[in-house]
Amino acid sequence: MASQYAAELCMLLVEDNFGELFGRIFSTLHRYERLTLPRLLGLTRLSENRLRAALVAMIQHHLVHFYTAVEEGGVTYYSANMQAAYYLIRSGKILEFVEDRLGKYAATVMSTIMYLGHAQVSHLDTLPELRSDASKTNGVNEGEHDRPEGENETNGTNGEHVSDQPALLHPTLKALAGHGYIVRVREAHFQSIADNILNIERQIRSGDSVQSMKGKKLEEFVVEKTADMLKERLDGDLTRGLIVNGVPRGVKRSQTNGVSDDNETEKARFDYDDGEDEDEENEWLDDEVPMESSLTVRVNYEKLDVALRNRRFLELAERGAPPESAQIYDYLLRRIEYQTSKCRDASEIPREGEEGEQYSVPIPLSALARDIDPYLDLAGSLGPTNTPANNRLGKRTFDDTVDDNDDDHGATGNRTYEIDQHLSLLAQPPLNLTSKRLNGGIINWTVEFRHLARKLRHLELERIVEARYGDVALRVLRVLQAKGKLDEKRLQEISLLPFKDLRQVLASMQTGGFVDLQEVPRDAQRQPSRTIYLWYYDPDRARDSMLQDTYKAMSRCLQRLKFERGRLKDFLEKTERSDVKGNEELYLSEGELDRLREWRAKEALLIGEVARLDDMIAVMRDY
C-alpha cells in the first residue's frame, strides 16, 4: 500500500481528522520509515514536549507503531501505520453498518471507541454521551425500531423506575464483542507485524529447543512456530463465552410475517435465536454481569471488512436470484460471518491464478432451517414441483383442495428441502455463490471466498472498461480473459469486429493499461515481418494500475474539499457557531442560506465520491 498516492492519501486523511501537527509527523515517519525520537525531532523541527504529546496521541489512535529494541540499549523506534490511517476513510461506512445491525446506541458506542482510538471499559462508563442515552432508551434489542423524536421515554412514570433497568453500555459492549466488532487491545497491536515477527524469531532462535536443529529443519520449525506465536500475540478475541450454537448470545429470531410494511433497513436486519436454548429467561439476566472494568477495547477493522464483504456478496445474490433466495443467502452469510475473523490470512494482495481455494466454515442445513423466518414463502419462488391431476372434465378433483392439517404436517418436512433448493439455485452458474458439502450424511453449505472475491474484482474491472471505452472494449476484454494471448487476426475472428474498430479499441485500452502486446520473433533476426504480435490481458497489472488511479482520485477529492473549505473559511466558521448551528434560518440571510446549501451539496458530492472510490479499493485490495 505504501505507494506515492497511497501515502499522500493517508497523510491527507490524518491531517483532515487530527490537524496539521499529526499530518506533519505522519508524513515524516512515512518518508523516512523507522525513526528514533532524536532523529524525528531534527526532521520535524518541533519541540520535544510537543512531539512527545503528539506521539502519545497518535499511538493511542494506532496511527504510529513503536518498538523498543532491548538489544540496542532500549532505543525506541517509531513508524507510520498506513492501514490504520486509511481506515479513517471507512469510519462512516462502518458506523452506518453497525447502526443497521445493532441499533443507534451501538453505533454511538462504536463511534466513541473510534474517536478515542482505544478505551478502557471503566473510562467508557464515565462518558456523559454514553450515560445520557442509557436513561432515554427503553432497551437494546437487536432489530428494534427507531422511535420518532419525542417518543424515546424513560422506562417508568416520570423516570422513577430508570434504575430498575441496567445501563445499556455493558450489554451493548457485549453485543459488539459477540459479533467480533471490538477486540481486546494487546501489547503486540502497538508494534508493526515486521517488528513482532523479528522479535518472535529472535526469541525462538535463542531458546533451548532449537539448539539441536540445523539447516532446512531449523528454518521450517522457526517459520511454523513464528506463525503460531504471532497469532497468539495478536489474538484479542472477546467472543469466547458470548457465542452460543454459532451465533452471539441474546440474538433473537425475527418474528415478522413477511408481509410487514417495514422499511428496507428493517427488512435487511435478520436476527437469530440462541439455537436450542429454549429457556424463557429475562434477556437482561445475562447482561447484569458487567464487562471487566480494566478491559481495554478497540475497533476490529478486519472483522468489519468481513461483514462489508458479505454485504457485497449479498448484492450479487440480489441481482441474480429471487428475493427469497437472497434472504436465505443473507442468513447463511450471517452465520459464516460470526465464525470468520478476517478476509484472508495473507496481508499481501494475492496474484491472479496463484491464490488457492478458501472455503468458509460449513453451516449445517438444519441450523439454517431453525434461523429462517417460518413465515417466509419459500415454495412460491421456486414454482410448482408437480402438476396437479385433473378429472375428465379438466377440473381439479375435490381432494386437491388445500387442507390446513396436511399443510401443517408437510410444511415441517418440506421446509428444509425448500431451503436446500434455494441454496442449490445460488450454487448454479453463473452465480456460483454457494457450495454444497456432505459430512457424515449431514448437508452443509459453504461459501468459496477467493472465487467470489475474484469475481467481484473482475466485475469491477469490466465495469470500468465499459464506462471508459464502451461495450466493444468489454467484449474484447472478455475474449482475452477467456482465451489468453491471441494475435490480431484470431482476436478479430472470435470477437466478430471489423479490423479498424478492433485496432482503435486495442490502442485505447493499451494506453489505459488494460491490455498489452507481446512480441514473439520467429527467428533470431527479430525482423518485424517475422514476428508474431500477441495481445493479452493481465488482471493483476490492471488491478494495480486501478489501485494507484483510485488512490490519486481520492487524494484529489480531499484536496479539493480542503481548498473549498479554505475559500469559505470565514463563512463556515460563522455557520458552525453554537448559536447559529441549527438555527441557520434565523441568523443567516437568503444569500447566505443559498451559499450554505451550495456548499453542503458540493461537500456531499465530494465525500460521496470518496466513499464510492473506497468501495473500489475494498474490492481490489481488501476482499
Swiss-Prot record:
Annotated protein name in UniProt: DNA-directed RNA polymerase III subunit rpc3
Pfam families: HTH_9 (PF08221), POLR3C_WHD (PF22536), RNA_pol_Rpc82 (PF05645)
Function: DNA-dependent RNA polymerase catalyzes the transcription of DNA into RNA using the four ribonucleoside triphosphates as substrates. Specific core component of RNA polymerase III which synthesizes small RNAs, such as 5S rRNA and tRNAs.
Family annotation (PANTHER family): DNA-DIRECTED RNA POLYMERASE III SUBUNIT RPC3, RNA POLYMERASE III DNA DIRECTED -RELATED
GO biological process, alphabetically ordered: DNA-templated transcription
UniProt region (Leucine-zipper), positions on chain: 550-571
Localization: Nucleus
Main location: nucleus
UniProt record similarity statement: Belongs to the RNA polymerase beta chain family.
Residue ranges of the region described as Disordered: 131-164, 249-282, 381-412
GO MF assignments: single-stranded DNA binding
Complex and partners: Component of the RNA polymerase III (Pol III) complex consisting of 17 subunits.
One GO term describing the cellular component: RNA polymerase III complex
InterPro entries for this protein: POLR3C_WHD, RNA_pol_III_RPC82-rel_HTH, RNA_pol_III_Rpc82_C, RPC3, WH-like_DNA-bd_sf
The entry's keywords: DNA-directed RNA polymerase, Nucleus, Transcription, Zinc
Biased composition (Acidic residues): 273-282
